[in-house]
Each structure stands twice: as structure tokens, then as C-alpha cells.
């Protein structure tokens, strides 16, 4: 890989009257080495358009599939049972999610951002779905199976209509216009909070079965970071494939605990978190089944639930935006231009439309965990992620095989997520290097946006009941769903706060250099930087076939 970063180092400003003098460069050198800003991260082994060998690509792609599987199973566990679904319904929902994730990921890497991002499930849709479940949980159905299907049909209808929010703001360039008033000051909290806001998927989920979750976390750190230095001959293998090796070891350990009867006399919640013999999932999954349109029946369109989904669509757009910026750093690409982010949000809307048609349980968003995997392995190849879509689609069709891997206990995934999500946080913080890190104004914008976004989102989540009732409780249920969904999302709150503060707080007096605008501006226009086409142009002469707004 070739480093192409531009390194800028400005001379120190003269000291103002009444202020202590700025240390000279000689004094700074005596204090130790300083590192100039670098557009690309060091030590990446493969960038966005460089590829490992095919056998390495296949193994790395399977690793991406395993990482996204955890959140897929988690959201199915969260929503299917409250809907009235049985283990067979859960297996079919997981198959549908995997199938659509494969389709949407392939579309995004081909004609979306073209970054190596996996498009997985979005938890932003959980609150609106819980609202639908609540409305149908009043004994009006003859059986739980009937209630499940009716709920899924309503979710389908709501997803289909709400998808046009993403399509309109994306292909209508409204989202691109928002990105154009961004600066690195705004990107720092947006990217960092995309990961920090998922802290419940880390140690709290791990602690549900600490005897397998904690060993997974510790073993992965030791194997991937320490042993590679002790065993230099296999250091590359440990760095790239330690996740699969450690997961297999801890999964086998969990199976031994299960078979030995360690969980025979524990609570039901502990059994669900720790045991590996989820026979209900294996036995209920069909050998071969291809998800098809309207598999649950004709979609039901209900205005109150459709409006509730609108908020989730906006939240998912903010989540994906933060993930795209993180992926660009970890793939060795320049920051995605505004028109690229906008078209990807529009394509994300098309993905939600397809998910509504095929009967998925939520909309999609860019997977934070899989972007963290780019940093863990130091491989940002687009081809690896594209090949991973084969595994998603294959295991969605051959259900028994998919159910086998879906039986991995969630605390094992949580141990992995503790590391992957932490990497994305650090990537978000790295954007601060392009700004004046000694500016109190910049510190104020970043600090307040970070803290308040997490604090507000945590308040809304902590005060939301299992039935989906949030802190906003007016007479309009659809209005409640929109506000509760928006403010329960740390990334969207961070986007709102940072954008307002950075563009209004001393905006006329703060220099563009201090805000990082000279570095940022070339990436916000189609022809602003010559490398934009290198990373983000469409393949196979698609540019000549599609209208400009779709490019």
C-alpha cells in the first residue's frame, strides 16, 4: 500500500500581548517527537482496491459473516418472541435478515459508497416495532401464530413507506447538502458516538454469561495483540484470523460446559445466554428455503405506525454516515464526498424497501462491528466484504447450516464487540488531528456533543419500558414514536448538536484552518480531489447510464 497523505505543519502563531509566549519549535523538539496529520492510517496491509489472495479472501470474508451474525441473532431474539413467533418463525426471520444483508451489502459496495461496509440490521427500528407489537397485544387474535403474521405484515407495510424517507433525502441530495456543512469537528463526535452508543452490546451483554464472554475477550486480546510478537513466524496468521481461532476455542469450551450439566440448575435467562444446544433453532430451521416477497402475507399500511418508522429511517441514515467515515479511514481511502454519502443513503432506502417487500423485521444500516473488523485485521479490501455476501446468502438459503452458527452464545459475540467497537471509537477521535486541538472552541463543540448525545440517548433508553413506551408520552402515538426514536439515538443527537454548535458558535471568528476546513473542503465536491474518482467512481461504465443525482 502506498501512503498518500498530505502532511501539513503550520508554524506557531506569535504570542498575543498579555499571554504567555508560544514554545518555539526547538523547545517542542526537546519535549519529544510530534506527529503531523496523516490522511491515511499507517500499517494498513490492504486498502480498498488492493486484495489478498483468494484463499485468504474467503477466510476473511467468512470472518465478516460471523461478526454480523451476532447482531442478527440478537435482534431476532429481541423482537420475534414478543410478536408471538415460535422458534420456526425466528429461524425464518434470521434467514430473511441474512438474505437481505447480503443483497444490500453487495449493492452498497457496487453502486453505493463503494466502501467495504457490511449492511446489517438497524436497532433504530426496534422502538417503532415494539409500538406495533403493543398495539396488537390485546387479545384480538385467535392464536399467537396469527398475531405474529399480522404484526409482521404491519412491519412490512411500515418499512415500505418509510423507505422513501431515505430515498428522497438521499437521491434528492438533501443529505449531501447536510454533509457539505460538516467539518472534522463534527465528524469526531458523529463517528465516535456511533460506536460508544452501542456500549450495551459490549460488557453488559458479555456479563450475561461471564464464564464464556470474559475468556473470549481476554483470549482475543492476548492472541491477536501479544502472541503475534512472541511467534513471529505466524504473526500474520494471528493478526488476521485470531478472531476465528478464539471463537472456535471458546465455543467448544461453552459446549463442554453445556454437556457437563453446568447450566442444568440455573435460571432460564442464564440458559438462553450460555447454552450452545439451541435444538429448537436447529430443528426448526428448514434445510433449504429461499426468502421470497410478501412471505408473511399482504403488507398492512397503518398511518400511525408508518410515521413512527420515519424517525427510525432518519436515525439509520445518521448511523450509516458515521460508519462510512470510519470505514474510509480503515480502508485507506479519502473521506467520502458529500454526493457519495448522499447516494448511499438513497440506496439504503432502496434496501429498506426491499426488506419490507421480502419481510425483514427491521431496516438496514452500516454495521459498526464489521468496520471495527477492518481495523482489527488491518485489511480494508472491498473484495473481502463483497465475497462475504456469498456466505450471508448461502446460509440464508441453507437454513440448517446457518442455524448451526447462529447457536453461538451471544456473550461470545459481546467479547468480540468490546474490541471492535473500541477500534471505531478511536478512529472517530483520529479525525481531530485535522483541526486545531488547542482551540477551546473546538474542545467545547466536541466535548458537549459527545457528552450530551450519550447522556440524552441513555435517558431515553433507560426510561423506555419493555413495551416500547418512551419518555415522550403525548396523545399522538406516532408523534411519540418519532421523538422517542430520534432522541434514543446517540449518533443522530450528536449529528444535530455538533452541526448546530460548529456552524453557529463563533463561526464568523473561528478560522477555517482551526476547524479543519482546508483539509475537508476538497472531499465535499465531486471534482474537489482527484482521488475521489479513484475510490468512489462507479464500476463498468455505470456513470454513463445513470442520472447524475444517482451518482
UniProtKB/Swiss-Prot annotation:
GO CC entries: plasma membrane; plasmodesma
Region called Disordered, residue ranges: 1-30
Membrane topology listed for this record: Multi-pass membrane protein
Tissue and organ expression note: Expressed in the apical meristem 4 days after imbibition (DAI). Expressed in the major veins of rosette leaves and pedicels. Expressed in the root central cylinder, root meristems, root tips and lateral root primordia.
InterPro entries named among the record's database cross-references: NCS2 (IPR006043)
Major location category of this protein: membrane
Transmembrane segments: 56-76, 92-111, 117-136, 158-178, 179-199, 202-222, 242-262, 306-326, 390-410, 412-432, 442-462, 481-501
GO biological process assignments: adenine import across plasma membrane; guanine import across plasma membrane; hypoxanthine transport; uracil import across plasma membrane
GO MF annotations in UniProt: adenine transmembrane transporter activity; guanine transmembrane transporter activity; solute:monoatomic cation symporter activity; uracil transmembrane transporter activity
Keywords associated with the record: Membrane, Transmembrane, Transmembrane helix, Transport
Subcellular location field: Membrane
Similarity comment: Belongs to the nucleobase:cation symporter-2 (NCS2) (TC 2.A.40) family.
NCBIfam families recorded: NCS2_1
Name of the protein in question: Nucleobase-ascorbate transporter 3
Lineage: Eukaryota, Viridiplantae, Streptophyta, Embryophyta, Tracheophyta
Gene: NAT3
